[in-house]
Amino acid sequence: YSSITEQLLERIAPLMSETPMVPIHGDCHMGNILWRDDIPHFVDFDDCMSGPPIQDLWMLLSGERADRTFQLSLILDAYQEFYDFDTSTLQLIEPLRTLRIMYHAAWIARRWQDPAFPLAFPTFDTVNYWSNHVLALREQLAMLDEPPLTYFG
């Protein structure tokens, strides 16, 4: 585990060091957007932080690469009506996804003594969980070599 995480962090750190940070939601996914009368309402602000705007936007993307590219185009077209978007930060999507995967496991580990956590994450302390987690990190290492999504806005 330490070997793969060290490899990932060595690859990711230089990319993040030059990235401008702004206030972001920090956990902006479809489950944290409630819709009423065709108006989105964002909830769950306990993870607000400073980060690159793409951190909030990539979590709204799903599906295969073509689907994500199309969704990204729609999101960035709308986003740029209010604020300029630095397309060079598209290269951060997979590094940020990797950090989120690592952070999620660390978050569970930090809270493991809370009686609710073993109930909510019953496989966390199993070999299977950690085998799958390491496999996901290895897949992310390969994804870091893939070209980023493109935006033609």
Short names for language-model regions:
Residues I24, H29-M30, L34:
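Canonical protein kinase catalytic loop motif
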Residues P53-F85, R100-A116:
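Active-site activation/catalytic loop segments of kinase-like enzymes and analogous catalytic loops
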Residues W107-G153:
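ATP/Mg2+ or Mg2+-diphosphate-binding catalytic cores
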Residues Y1-G26, L149-T150:
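An alpha-helical support segment within catalytic cores of ATP-dependent transferases
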Residues N32-F42:
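Conserved protein kinase catalytic/activation segment
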